[in-house]
């Protein structure tokens, strides 16, 4: 079976292109994608098409840090019911467990691994995100989503990237506000145990359960 990806997150890439002054529509149309398709809830595309689109965009935008701009344009609805289940989670750990359990709603080749370490909870992102800007996008949205639930004062203990250090590395240091390492063995970030286990007033177990049930039906 061919792996597929949720199409709605492509809206983030569309907006990044526009932010750099590009007309996104013809770029997407070359891949057979229009904005009406992106706006259709639950619409999916093949892994090959998603990869081709990302490679085209990476070839157009000169700035190697463009993936970090995803944090400006993402919305929980881009990730279907997982985004809303995230918002309703009572702790960051609960939200991250959901993101790990239901990662396939975003991409059937996606995997998020969680591990408790002496430094805190380590979140390792999927090996399938081999294109550096795509990993940057995923990592920037992850910490943005954590800050959305927890508060803007949340900073990781440390952030690690497999890809090499770009000339714009200061943008990583500024955005994550934490030690950022490049040329490492895995793409991961660490959050303190006190942060991930803090009870959050935004939590709503009933709403979280409703969205969990929707995700389970969607993935069935």
What would you call each of these model-derived segments?
Residues 1-121, 141:
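N-terminal low-complexity or simple alpha-helical regulatory segments
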Residues 102, 141-145, 149, 214-217:
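Conserved short hydrophobic interaction patches
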Residues 132-135, 139, 204, 208:
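Short, charged, low-complexity patches
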Residues 79-85, 126-129, 196-197, 215-217:
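Short hinge/gating elements
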Residues 3-6, 25-26, 106-136, 144-165:
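Conserved binding/catalytic microenvironments
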Residues 1-9, 122, 131, 209-218:
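Surface-exposed, interaction-prone regions with an acidic/low-complexity signature
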Residues 174-220:
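Extended mid-to-C-terminal alpha-helical interaction segments
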Residues 165-172:
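Charged mid-protein connector segments
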């Amino acid at each position: 079976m061919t792996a597929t990806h949720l199409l709605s997150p492509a809206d983030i890439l569309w907006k990044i292109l526009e932010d750099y002054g590009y007309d996104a529509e013809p770029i997407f149309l070359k891949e057979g994608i229009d904005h009406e398709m992106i706006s259709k809830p639950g619409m999916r595309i093949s892994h090959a098409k998603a990869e081709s689109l990302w490679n085209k965009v990476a070839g157009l935008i000169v700035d190697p840090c463009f993936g970090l701009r995803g944090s400006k344009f993402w919305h929980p609805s881009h990730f279907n019911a997982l985004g809303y289940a995230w918002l309703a989670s009572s702790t960051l750990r609960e939200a991250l467990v959901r993101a790990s359990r239901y990662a396939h709603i975003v991409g059937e080749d996606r995997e998020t691994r969680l591990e408790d370490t002496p430094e805190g909870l380590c979140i390792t992102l999927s090996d399938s995100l081999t294109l550096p800007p795509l990993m940057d996008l995923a990592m920037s949205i992850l910490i943005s989503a954590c800050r959305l639930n927890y508060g803007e004062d949340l900073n990781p203990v440390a952030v690690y990237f497999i890809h090499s250090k770009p000339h714009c590395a200061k943008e990583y240091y500024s955005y994550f506000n934490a030690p950022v390492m490049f040329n490492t063995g895995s793409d991961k970030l660490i959050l303190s145990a006190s942060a991930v286990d803090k009870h959050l007033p935004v939590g709503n177990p009933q709403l979280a359960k409703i969205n969990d049930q929707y995700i389970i039906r969607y993935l069935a």
